[in-house]
UniProtKB/Swiss-Prot annotation:
<keyword id="KW-0554">One-carbon metabolism</keyword>
<dbReference type="GO" id="GO:0005737">
    <property type="term" value="C:cytoplasm"/>
</dbReference>
<comment type="similarity">
    <text>Belongs to the MCH family.</text>
</comment>
<keyword id="KW-0963">Cytoplasm</keyword>
<dbReference type="Pfam" id="PF02289">
    <property type="entry name" value="MCH"/>
</dbReference>
<dbReference type="GO" id="GO:0018759">
    <property type="term" value="F:methenyltetrahydromethanopterin cyclohydrolase activity"/>
</dbReference>
<dbReference type="InterPro" id="IPR003209">
    <property type="entry name" value="METHMP_CycHdrlase"/>
</dbReference>
<dbReference type="GO" id="GO:0019386">
    <property type="term" value="P:methanogenesis, from carbon dioxide"/>
</dbReference>
<keyword id="KW-0484">Methanogenesis</keyword>
<comment type="pathway">
    <text>One-carbon metabolism; methanogenesis from CO(2); 5,10-methenyl-5,6,7,8-tetrahydromethanopterin from CO(2): step 3/3.</text>
</comment>
<keyword id="KW-0378">Hydrolase</keyword>
<protein>
    <recommendedName>
        <fullName>Methenyltetrahydromethanopterin cyclohydrolase</fullName>
        <ecNumber>3.5.4.27</ecNumber>
    </recommendedName>
</protein>
<comment type="function">
    <text>Catalyzes the reversible interconversion of 5-formyl-H(4)MPT to methenyl-H(4)MPT(+).</text>
</comment>
<dbReference type="GO" id="GO:0006730">
    <property type="term" value="P:one-carbon metabolic process"/>
</dbReference>
Length: 318
């Protein structure tokens, strides 16, 4: 079975070899763990963001940038993501399934290290995936860098030595944060299908694109814009082999949610910033195209809503 930690570590090695080119800042801590600053203080940009996204997906995806029009008005950068291992790349690796709260430090953990720590265990049981590697790679969405105690905790949970852990760190409101969160557009569709009860192992390949949101000064506002990129302008194409996918397609798009129609930050604020008051169905791409190769049929659902996306991004024409 492929090891997503092994594959991701090869990407990390490239990042370390060309740290200055990617404008990232590696730090070796007292316990010999490695923390790579990708946006807390470092001035990393698009290229580091693409690699960060690949690491989040266990090295099982290709990422690239392109230029598309938003609402037929302005050309804007989009991220494109493709994978031939959708369930593993998105659920076993990319899903932010590890809430890290240790020694006063909080971060959302993504990436292949989750597979070693089984965070959460149910995810790996459902897709029947396990990783066994002596090095752990984790991606942290946080506005601070972790200290030795945090890295010791991650190592312990993963069953490896602290010297065999590397963490990539980027805040939500940073260029890398914008890229890697927009790069979750495919994951949104795969996760939604998993929550609906679809066996995601039937998904053969996946492709998605979403605009890379502008960086906001306020982290809470940035959380809104980064989600809106996929919720209102994310497009995903899935190649599926059976599994009665036709019954699930209409339920995938974000427009099926009761919270759809307003910028995410507005909805979140109305809910008094309580995630439990939000409809989880909102975390989905705007539109999906699904080709079922077992029947030869292709289904579409949802639509792009550029108006809400641009409202969220806060574009001002001068």
């Amino acid at each position: 079975m492929i090891s997503i930690n092994e594959i991701s570590y090869s990407i990390v090695e490239e990042m370390l070899d060309f740290a200055e080119d990617y404008r990232i800042e590696p730090h070796t801590l007292a316990n010999d763990s490695v923390v790579i600053d990708c946006g807390v203080k470092a001035k990393a940009g698009y290229e580091a963001g693409l690699l960060f996204t690949q690491v989040c997906m266990g090295g099982l995806a290709q990422t690239s940038l392109t230029h598309k029009k938003l609402k037929h008005e302005v050309f804007y950068p989009f991220i494109e993501v493709s994978t031939d291992f959708p369930a593993i790349a998105c659920l076993a690796a990319q899903k932010a399934g590890w809430r890290i709260s240790q020694d006063g430090y909080f971060a959302m953990g993504s990436g292949p290290a989750r597979a070693l720590a089984l965070k959460p265990k149910h995810t790996y049981e459902v897709i029947e995936y396990e990783d066994d590697y002596d090095f752990a790679v984790i991606a942290l969405e946080a506005d601070k860098l972790p200290n030795e105690k945090v890295m010791d905790y991650i190592a312990s949970e993963c069953g490896v030595d602290s010297s065999d852990v590397v963490a990539l760190v980027a805040p939500t409101n940073s260029p890398v944060g914008s890229v890697q969160i927009a790069g979750r557009v495919v994951e949104m569709a795969i996760y939604k299908l998993a929550e609906l009860g679809f066996d995601t192992r039937h998904i053969v390949s996946a492709f998605g694109s979403a605009p890379i949101p502008p960086v906001k000064k306020d982290a809470a506002v940035a959380m809104g814009t980064t989600n809106d990129a996929s919720i209102y302008h994310g497009s995903v194409t899935l190649t599926v082999d059976g599994g009665n996918i036709k019954d699930f397609v209409p339920k995938i798009p974000s427009s099926t949610s009761k919270d759809y129609g307003k910028p995410f930050y507005t909805v979140f604020k109305e809910a008094k910033f309580d995630f439990y008051k939000l409809d989880p169905g909102i975390f989905a791409p705007a539109e999906v195209v699904v080709n079922d190769i077992s029947t030869g049929e292709t289904y579409i659902a949802g639509k792009i809503n550029a108006d809400v996306c641009m409202e969220s991004f806060g574009f001002k024409k001068l």
